[in-house]
Design a protein with these regions (language model features):
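Short Gly/Thr/Asp-enriched flexible loops that form oxyanion-binding sites at enzyme active sites
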Residues: 106-125, 214-218, 366-373
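N-terminal phosphate-binding or glycine-rich loops at protein starts, especially the Walker A/P-loop
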Residues: 2-47, 103, 113-122, 126-131
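Gly/Ser/Thr-rich loops at beta-strand to alpha-helix junctions
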Residues: 12-19, 102, 106-116, 136, ...
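Phosphate/nucleotide-donor binding subsite
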Residues: 50-98
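Short, acidic/small-residue loops that bind anionic groups at enzyme active sites
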Residues: 103-106, 115-144, 153-154, 229-233, ...
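Glycine-rich phosphate/diphosphate-binding loop of Rossmann-like nucleotide-binding domains
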Residues: 17-25, 38, 47-54, 196-235, ...
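C-terminal non-catalytic interaction/assembly regions of soluble proteins
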Residues: 2-3, 7-9, 17-38, 268-423
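Cap/lid and interdomain-hinge subdomains that line or gate substrate/regulatory clefts
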Residues: 72-76, 139-209, 333, 395-397
């Protein structure tokens, strides 16, 4: 069994926060003096210090920028930041590919966090990533996106070494040391830093109103030897699943809960983006797509629901989330979008199917419940069937709702058959 010296990359803008980064370095080494700390300067101007491993001009040149000595400092701030991100991504990527780093950490305000997070998002899921940031107590979705970046709030600004900031940095240093050592341990044991499994991985999308059906499908798949990853369909959940497909970590997809498309269409808070429903199709892996929770759009507190939706059927799911029923017209458009994205991206339509639960697409859409609306549902189903007619993507209709046990077992079993068919 080979062993490695744990190495941690520290990336940031040293021209504005050198003292803070040097303190971070000292705390990492105080925790374990054997660790190799690589300081990577992604700032605006060159900093001369013996502790800096990869200097700012090296990062800029790694981006491919020409004429560094004469033109770099004259770049507009936005262009300069983009250049440094591009260069830092290249530098850090090379270090990772050569097994020369086992974790990465940064400190920053909004600018430094933007640079560091852009670099970290290019690293694989499970590789240790930590940012101490002044913006970490707010909405960090634009920084974290679909990755596993850990954000730690700095409490005070990263501007001078006071006792509060030093305590936060000490904690962050200990955290990244522990994370990096755990990663190295996996490398030494497995030969790679990922979770070790010999099972084929399945991704399933879930929402509260599709939980019963998803759990039943999950249990069936697990009992038949699959490793199941459930993704909460909150925008970031769907994007995370798509990313893991791109990283070749999943062998099949049960996209039972495509509700993020409804939020994308109507401006809800759980929107993914236009790449949703494309990764598995482009990868050619087996997938079964359904229409879970397309009966709803998600907004914040009830008083925050846009006026144009106030006259619709609303359900206050909890104090933070209000559900709005999708209309017949919206459901028709959603059906068209699902079909179109699959048709445009599928390289193996023979391994892609769409399943429709005719008696309800969520726990709130069955007879007697608040969102039960056969006209809207039928518009959704018809649009999918019409748009996919003539394609090689098959559509299956079941006379049940999406949480029925018979539905769950049938759809899970069928996915396993498609995986076996692919080989």
């Amino acid at each position: 069994m080979s062993s490695r010296r744990t190495s941690i990359a520290v990336v940031g803008t040293f021209d504005t926060k050198l003292d803070e980064f040097l303190y971070l370095r000292s705390q990492i080494l105080e925790d374990d003096s054997s660790i190799n700390v690589i300081l990577i300067d992604a700032g605006r101007s060159v900093v001369q210090h013996e502790a800096v491993t990869i200097k700012q001009d090296e990062v800029a040149k790694a981006s491919g920028f020409q004429g560094f000595e004469n033109d770099f400092m004259s770049l507009p701030r936005g262009d300069l930041v983009k250049t440094m991100i591009k260069g830092a991504v290249k530098v850090v990527g090379r270090l990772k590919d050569r097994d020369e780093i086992h974790g990465i950490i940064s400190l920053g305000g909004s600018g430094g966090t933007s640079i560091a997070s852009a670099v970290m998002r290019e690293l694989p899921v499970t590789f240790p990533k930590l940012i101490v940031s002044t913006v970490a107590s707010g909405d960090v979705s634009s920084y974290v996106a679909e990755t596993d970046i850990t954000m730690m709030y700095s409490v005070v600004d990263i501007a001078g070494l006071n006792e509060v900031l030093k305590a936060v940095v000490q904690t962050a240093a200990a955290a990244i040391v522990g994370m990096a050592k755990a990663y190295v341990k996996k490398l030494n044991n497995n030969g790679h830093g990922d979770i070790k499994t010999t099972k084929k991985g399945i991704g399933i999308t879930m929402f509260g109103v599709t939980t019963k059906g998803v759990n039943a499908a999950r249990k069936w798949l697990e009992s038949h030897g699959f490793e199941v990853y459930v993704f909460h369909a909150t925008g970031s959940g769907g994007r995370s699943m798509e990313r893991l497909v791109k990283e070749n970590r999943l062998h099949g997809i049960l996209d039972l809960t495509t509700t993020e498309l409804a939020d994308e269409l109507a401006g809800g808070v759980f929107s993914a983006d236009s790449s949703r429903l494309t990764a598995a199709a482009k990868a050619g892996i087996p997938q079964i797509v359904s229409v879970g929770a397309l009966d709803m759009v998600n907004f914040g507190p009830k008083d925050a629901v846009p006026k144009k939706f106030q006259e619709r059927r609303l359900i206050e799911h909890n104090p933070s989330i209000t559900l709005v029923r999708t209309t017949k017209e919206e459901c028709e458009e959603l059906g068209n979008r699902i079909a179109q994205r699959l048709k445009e991206n599928c390289i193996r339509p023979d391994l892609t199917e769409v399943w429709l639960p005719l008696r309800g697409v969520s726990a709130l859409d069955i007879e007697g419940q608040a969102f039960y609306d056969t006209l809207a549902d039928n518009a959704l189903f018809k649009a999918i069937k019409t748009s996919l007619d003539g394609s090689e993507i098959s559509v299956k209709e079941l006379d049940t709702d999406i949480n029925d046990p018979s539905w769950s077992e049938s759809i899970a079993k069928r996915l396993s058959e498609l995986i076996e068919l692919k080989g």
